[in-house]
Amino acid sequence: MNLILMGLPGAGKGTQAEQIVAKYNIPHISTGDMFRAAMKAETEMGLQAKSFIDKGALVPDEVTIGIVRERLSQEDCVRGFLLDGFPRTVAQASALEEIMKDLGKKIDYVLNINVDSGLLLKRLTGRRICKECGATYHLEFNPPAKADVCDKCGGELYQRSDDNEETVANRLDVNIKQTKPLLDFYDELGYLKSINGEQDINKVFADIDVLIGGLA
Protein backbone atom coordinates (compact mmCIF):
# COMPACT_ATOMS: atom_id res chain seq x y z
CA MET A 1 0.00 0.00 0.00
CA ASN A 2 1.40 3.33 -1.10
CA LEU A 3 -0.13 6.16 0.91
CA ILE A 4 0.23 9.91 1.34
CA LEU A 5 -0.96 11.45 4.62
CA MET A 6 -2.20 15.05 4.64
CA GLY A 7 -3.83 17.32 7.19
CA LEU A 8 -3.48 20.77 8.70
CA PRO A 9 -1.41 21.41 11.86
CA GLY A 10 -3.28 19.97 14.84
CA ALA A 11 -5.28 17.48 12.76
CA GLY A 12 -3.55 14.52 14.44
CA LYS A 13 -1.45 13.25 11.53
CA GLY A 14 1.39 12.06 13.78
CA THR A 15 -0.89 9.88 15.91
CA GLN A 16 -2.53 8.29 12.87
CA ALA A 17 0.81 7.75 11.11
CA GLU A 18 2.09 5.82 14.15
CA GLN A 19 -0.96 3.54 14.14
CA ILE A 20 -0.85 2.92 10.36
CA VAL A 21 2.84 1.95 10.27
CA ALA A 22 2.51 -0.18 13.42
CA LYS A 23 -0.39 -2.21 12.04
CA TYR A 24 0.72 -2.53 8.41
CA ASN A 25 4.50 -2.62 8.89
CA ILE A 26 5.30 -0.04 6.21
CA PRO A 27 7.87 2.75 6.63
CA HIS A 28 6.72 6.20 7.74
CA ILE A 29 8.64 8.53 5.44
CA SER A 30 8.73 12.16 6.51
CA THR A 31 10.58 14.84 4.57
CA GLY A 32 12.91 15.65 7.47
CA ASP A 33 13.85 12.00 8.04
CA MET A 34 14.51 11.53 4.31
CA PHE A 35 16.88 14.48 4.16
CA ARG A 36 18.75 13.47 7.33
CA ALA A 37 19.17 9.86 6.15
CA ALA A 38 20.33 10.88 2.66
CA MET A 39 22.88 13.33 4.07
CA LYS A 40 24.14 10.83 6.65
CA ALA A 41 24.51 8.11 3.98
CA GLU A 42 26.20 10.69 1.71
CA THR A 43 24.11 9.71 -1.30
CA GLU A 44 24.53 11.83 -4.41
CA MET A 45 21.32 13.74 -3.70
CA GLY A 46 22.06 13.88 0.03
CA LEU A 47 25.37 15.63 -0.63
CA GLN A 48 23.67 18.08 -2.97
CA ALA A 49 21.01 18.84 -0.34
CA LYS A 50 23.72 19.34 2.31
CA SER A 51 25.51 21.89 0.13
CA PHE A 52 22.34 24.03 -0.01
CA ILE A 53 21.44 23.57 3.67
CA ASP A 54 24.99 24.47 4.79
CA LYS A 55 24.65 27.76 2.89
CA GLY A 56 21.27 28.42 4.52
CA ALA A 57 19.59 28.16 1.11
CA LEU A 58 16.34 26.40 0.21
CA VAL A 59 16.85 22.96 -1.29
CA PRO A 60 15.59 23.11 -4.91
CA ASP A 61 12.76 20.84 -6.05
CA GLU A 62 14.94 18.67 -8.29
CA VAL A 63 17.16 17.72 -5.32
CA THR A 64 14.17 17.05 -3.03
CA ILE A 65 12.56 14.93 -5.75
CA GLY A 66 15.85 13.06 -6.25
CA ILE A 67 15.96 12.25 -2.54
CA VAL A 68 12.36 11.00 -2.66
CA ARG A 69 13.24 8.80 -5.65
CA GLU A 70 16.24 7.34 -3.77
CA ARG A 71 14.13 6.66 -0.67
CA LEU A 72 11.17 5.05 -2.46
CA SER A 73 13.58 2.79 -4.37
CA GLN A 74 14.84 1.22 -1.13
CA GLU A 75 13.95 -2.34 -0.22
CA ASP A 76 11.76 -1.51 2.78
CA CYS A 77 9.31 0.28 0.44
CA VAL A 78 8.60 -2.83 -1.64
CA ARG A 79 5.43 -3.58 0.36
CA GLY A 80 4.44 0.06 0.53
CA PHE A 81 5.06 3.30 2.41
CA LEU A 82 3.39 6.22 4.13
CA LEU A 83 4.60 9.59 2.82
CA ASP A 84 4.22 12.54 5.20
CA GLY A 85 5.22 16.12 4.33
CA PHE A 86 5.76 15.42 0.63
CA PRO A 87 4.54 16.49 -1.85
CA ARG A 88 3.84 20.10 -0.85
CA THR A 89 3.10 21.50 -4.32
CA VAL A 90 1.39 20.34 -7.51
CA ALA A 91 4.80 20.38 -9.26
CA GLN A 92 6.17 17.96 -6.64
CA ALA A 93 3.02 15.82 -6.91
CA SER A 94 3.46 15.58 -10.70
CA ALA A 95 7.10 14.59 -10.23
CA LEU A 96 6.03 11.93 -7.71
CA GLU A 97 3.64 10.50 -10.31
CA GLU A 98 6.63 10.10 -12.68
CA ILE A 99 8.72 8.44 -9.95
CA MET A 100 5.93 5.97 -9.21
CA LYS A 101 5.53 5.21 -12.91
CA ASP A 102 9.28 4.55 -13.21
CA LEU A 103 9.11 2.21 -10.20
CA GLY A 104 6.10 0.38 -11.65
CA LYS A 105 3.90 1.50 -8.76
CA LYS A 106 1.06 3.90 -8.08
CA ILE A 107 -0.23 5.91 -5.15
CA ASP A 108 -3.23 4.07 -3.70
CA TYR A 109 -4.73 6.78 -1.51
CA VAL A 110 -4.09 10.31 -0.33
CA LEU A 111 -5.59 10.39 3.16
CA ASN A 112 -6.59 13.91 4.19
CA ILE A 113 -7.47 14.21 7.88
CA ASN A 114 -10.17 16.85 7.84
CA VAL A 115 -10.77 19.07 10.88
CA ASP A 116 -12.64 22.39 10.99
CA SER A 117 -10.19 25.29 11.31
CA GLY A 118 -12.10 26.64 14.35
CA LEU A 119 -11.51 23.36 16.19
CA LEU A 120 -7.86 23.31 15.09
CA LEU A 121 -7.47 26.82 16.51
CA LYS A 122 -8.83 25.57 19.84
CA ARG A 123 -6.54 22.52 19.77
CA LEU A 124 -3.41 24.51 18.94
CA THR A 125 -3.92 27.53 21.20
CA GLY A 126 -4.83 25.46 24.27
CA ARG A 127 -1.36 23.99 24.74
CA ARG A 128 0.50 24.92 27.94
CA ILE A 129 4.05 23.89 28.88
CA CYS A 130 5.77 23.73 32.28
CA LYS A 131 8.67 26.19 32.58
CA GLU A 132 10.50 23.82 34.93
CA CYS A 133 10.14 20.26 33.60
CA GLY A 134 8.70 20.77 30.09
CA ALA A 135 5.53 18.71 30.74
CA THR A 136 2.79 19.50 28.21
CA TYR A 137 -0.88 20.13 29.01
CA HIS A 138 -3.95 21.25 27.11
CA LEU A 139 -6.55 23.53 28.67
CA GLU A 140 -9.42 21.50 27.23
CA PHE A 141 -8.14 18.00 26.43
CA ASN A 142 -5.53 17.47 29.19
CA PRO A 143 -5.83 20.25 31.80
CA PRO A 144 -3.66 20.44 34.94
CA ALA A 145 -5.40 19.74 38.27
CA LYS A 146 -4.73 23.34 39.34
CA ALA A 147 -4.83 26.19 36.80
CA ASP A 148 -1.41 27.28 35.52
CA VAL A 149 0.45 24.85 37.82
CA CYS A 150 2.26 21.67 36.70
CA ASP A 151 0.88 18.48 38.26
CA LYS A 152 4.32 16.87 38.18
CA CYS A 153 6.64 19.48 39.68
CA GLY A 154 4.51 22.47 40.67
CA GLY A 155 6.21 24.65 38.06
CA GLU A 156 4.48 27.53 36.30
CA LEU A 157 2.74 26.76 33.00
CA TYR A 158 3.10 29.08 30.01
CA GLN A 159 1.88 29.40 26.42
CA ARG A 160 4.56 29.40 23.71
CA SER A 161 4.58 32.63 21.70
CA ASP A 162 3.86 30.74 18.46
CA ASP A 163 0.79 29.11 20.07
CA ASN A 164 -1.05 32.43 20.45
CA GLU A 165 -4.32 32.82 18.54
CA GLU A 166 -3.15 35.32 15.91
CA THR A 167 -0.01 33.34 15.00
CA VAL A 168 -1.90 30.04 14.85
CA ALA A 169 -4.73 31.55 12.77
CA ASN A 170 -2.18 32.92 10.28
CA ARG A 171 -0.37 29.57 10.13
CA LEU A 172 -3.62 27.73 9.42
CA ASP A 173 -4.61 30.26 6.76
CA VAL A 174 -1.28 29.85 4.95
CA ASN A 175 -1.56 26.04 5.14
CA ILE A 176 -5.12 26.02 3.79
CA LYS A 177 -4.12 28.17 0.81
CA GLN A 178 -1.01 26.06 0.10
CA THR A 179 -2.72 22.67 0.31
CA LYS A 180 -5.90 23.44 -1.66
CA PRO A 181 -4.29 23.08 -5.16
CA LEU A 182 -2.69 19.81 -4.02
CA LEU A 183 -5.98 18.42 -2.71
CA ASP A 184 -7.68 19.43 -5.98
CA PHE A 185 -4.91 17.69 -7.97
CA TYR A 186 -5.35 14.41 -6.08
CA ASP A 187 -9.12 14.68 -6.15
CA GLU A 188 -9.01 14.87 -9.96
CA LEU A 189 -6.80 11.76 -10.04
CA GLY A 190 -9.29 9.95 -7.81
CA TYR A 191 -6.74 9.30 -5.02
CA LEU A 192 -8.14 11.67 -2.40
CA LYS A 193 -9.98 10.23 0.60
CA SER A 194 -11.28 12.57 3.27
CA ILE A 195 -11.15 11.31 6.87
CA ASN A 196 -13.20 12.92 9.64
CA GLY A 197 -10.50 14.00 12.11
CA GLU A 198 -12.95 15.55 14.58
CA GLN A 199 -13.77 12.15 16.10
CA ASP A 200 -12.01 10.26 18.89
CA ILE A 201 -8.51 9.25 17.68
CA ASN A 202 -9.39 5.55 17.78
CA LYS A 203 -12.45 6.16 15.60
CA VAL A 204 -10.31 8.16 13.16
CA PHE A 205 -7.95 5.20 12.85
CA ALA A 206 -10.86 2.75 12.54
CA ASP A 207 -12.12 4.74 9.53
CA ILE A 208 -8.64 4.74 7.96
CA ASP A 209 -8.27 1.02 8.68
CA VAL A 210 -11.54 0.17 6.91
CA LEU A 211 -10.39 2.17 3.89
CA ILE A 212 -6.85 0.79 3.55
CA GLY A 213 -7.39 -2.71 4.94
CA GLY A 214 -8.21 -4.08 1.49
CA LEU A 215 -4.80 -2.97 0.17
CA ALA A 216 -2.80 -5.15 2.56
UniProtKB/Swiss-Prot annotation:
What does the subunit comment say? Monomer.
Ranked from the top, the taxonomy reads: Bacteria, Bacillati, Bacillota, Bacilli, Bacillales
As for family, the record states:
Belongs to the adenylate kinase family.
Q: Which residues bind ATP?
A: G10, A11, G12, K13, G14, T15, R127, T136, Y137, Q199
Pathway the protein takes part in: Purine metabolism; AMP biosynthesis via salvage pathway; AMP from ADP: step 1/1
Residue positions binding AMP: T31, R36, A57, L58, V59, G85, F86, P87, R88, Q92, R160, R171
Q: What does this protein do?
A: Catalyzes the reversible transfer of the terminal phosphate group between ATP and AMP. Plays an important role in cellular energy homeostasis and in adenine nucleotide metabolism.
Keyword field contains Glycoprotein: no
Q: MF terms per GO, please?
A: adenylate kinase activity; ATP binding; zinc ion binding
This protein's name:
Adenylate kinase
Task: Look up and give the organism this protein is from.
Answer: Bacillus cereus (strain G9842)
